[in-house]
Amino acid sequence: MKMVVLKPKINSKFHFGEGSLERNSKIFHSNSLFSAIVNNYIKLYGREDLEKNIEKIKNIRLSSLLYKIKNIYLIPKPEHPEFYKLKGNPGIKPKDIKKIQFFSIKAYKELLDNELDWKNKIKHIVDYQTINKSIVISEKEIEEIKRIFGIKAEKLKHAKISLISKHLEQKVAIDRLKDITLEKDDKGQLYNIEFIKLNENVEFYFLIDYNNEDKEFIKKLEASIKLIEDEGLGGKRSIGAGFFEKVEIVDLPEDFNEILDENSKYNNLEYKMLLGVGIPNKDDIKNIEYYKLIEIGGYIYSLECLTKPKRNILALTEGSIVKNDFIGDVKDISPQNDDDEQNKNNENNNKLNHKVYTHGKPILLPFNPKRDNYGS
């Protein structure tokens, strides 16, 4: 397994859409990351080579695009009731818990080892170990965070840090098919797009398991990942969004390696947490414990067809909790009408001549749920 670190260009902006240009996701999901890597693979080696290696490519495992603050790596909060419900903790409100979105991997490891006492010391954690009310870090990382951002306050909850900022930009609408400006009352129709920008100390990363020993295939896959430097990620790249100064493939940092190593002491835990989007196969349904759902859709990104919508599909979000036997799946979401007789007889139907896949085999992180009786 490897980590890919993506350093944004200075003043880079990103649009990771969620069905609306005016709404921007903080996470670029693993299914979209898979699509970007596959499209880069085609640009480098052609569709014929892709088809030859399609099963190898479908079997890789990916996390979503996550954040790192220098050497502090953030992962999603587990979608377990323990991290949403309060039981007799004076001075803490339910919203204090619900606002938390991420753990550092070091804090998460301490959670696995029962060193982070979530049940009995939640007020201390919220006051001293939580950045911007949304990111829980280890006590061992507090001084580093204060040094990086010049924080003088004793309690982190009193510090205001702009890690990720949102920006709205106004654009003129263009007809996707005719490539002309859409007008209303003889004026160009305007719309808003939301972008995010990262603090200079914040970068992206994701994890990838090649799940294969074929050195030639791995070399091609890594070249496709490196091409993200030039091709970028996310929407609105035509107007300068989504680009990176550097993309590096590195070994796993120590905390990740200790948790994910094949000989890790955590491998005997019964549960796992998803670090990417999970699409259950028919045998996985019984292994789903706690989850949130995301609807995957949007338009197909292909040089042969730029205006066809994908079939929508529901998937488990990052942070969902499953049992050890969960595998995940890769689904064909090609438009349903591409094979019907009417389209076959229409020369101008803008028909795809290849399959469109969405990836749902995420990196899984061992998870140790509390033994209290939380309801589903």
Swiss-Prot record:
Q: What is this protein called?
A: CRISPR system Cms protein Csm4
CDD domains given for it? Answer: Csm4_III-A
Disordered: region residues: 332-355
Q: Which organism is it from?
A: Methanocaldococcus jannaschii (strain ATCC 43067 / DSM 2661 / JAL-1 / JCM 10045 / NBRC 100440)
Record's subunit section? Part of the Csm effector complex that includes Cas10, Csm2, Csm3, Csm4 and Csm5. Stable Cas10/Csm1-Csm4, Csm3-Csm4 (which crystallizes as 2 heterodimers) and Cas10-Csm1-Csm3-Csm4 subcomplexes can be isolated.
Sections of the chain in a coiled coil: none
Q: What does this gene product do?
A: CRISPR (clustered regularly interspaced short palindromic repeat) is an adaptive immune system that provides protection against mobile genetic elements (viruses, transposable elements and conjugative plasmids). CRISPR clusters contain spacers, sequences complementary to antecedent mobile elements, and target invading nucleic acids. CRISPR clusters are transcribed and processed into CRISPR RNA (crRNA). The subunit probably binds to the 5' handle of the crRNA, helping in discrimination between self- and non-self. The Csm3-Csm4 complex binds both crRNA and a non-specific RNA; Csm4 alone also binds RNA.
- GO terms for molecular function, please? RNA binding
> Mind listing the UniProt keywords for this protein, alphabetically?
Antiviral defense, RNA-binding
Q: What else is known?
A: Encoded in a type III-A CRISPR locus.
What gene makes this protein?
csm4
List GO BP terms, alphabetically.
defense response to virus
Entry similarity comment: Belongs to the CRISPR-associated Csm4 family.
Q: Name one Pfam family in it.
A: RAMPs
Keyword Protease set for record: no
